[in-house]
Amino acid sequence: MKKSIVTFAAVNALASTLSASHLTTAQSDLSVDEAVKKFEKAVASRNITVFDVIEHSKLADQAGLKMTDTTVVIVGSPKIGTLLMQCEPKIALELPLKFLFYKDGDKTVIAYEDIKNIAARYGAQECDAVSKLSGAQANLLKDMAK
């Protein structure tokens, strides 16, 4: 319990929005693989679909190249995503949403682009689904601290 509270505080303290790249990030003490597994459980508990898990570092190994542990998890909810695409069909290029997990030193960084930033690029920031999706993204990141 104490570790969960400390981890939660650390994730909240380290979560930041990078203005240049529009990424929201947090750090975890878990390995990339452990963080991805925990994230997948959090996604499943919210009835969100994991569409794909792309293990870039394993693909690099297969190509005879080396890179730090890096995985992208592609997630979404057709019930919510469809509402956003009904509002602005071109935003379909950005869906489903992606979460990035990569090793940085002895930490795992979890990063995503807030749907609010994505929607703004398409002039869809007023769509009702944007706030709901943005909240879901933030809650998934918070779930990583539990």
Predicted regions and their residues:
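Positively charged n-region of N-terminal signal peptides that target proteins for export
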Residues: 1-4
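Bacterial N-terminal signal peptides
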Residues: 8-16
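Terminal, regulation- and interaction-focused segments at domain boundaries
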Residues: 19-50, 142-143
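Small-molecule pocket liners
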Residues: 22, 71, 108
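Stable alpha-helical elements in mature extracytoplasmic
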Residues: 35, 39, 56, 133-137
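Compact, glycine-rich, soluble single-domain proteins
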Residues: 48-95, 100
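Beta-strand/loop substructures that line and gate deep hydrophobic ligand-binding cavities in soluble
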Residues: 98-123
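C-terminal partner/receptor-binding element of secreted or periplasmic proteins
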Residues: 116-146
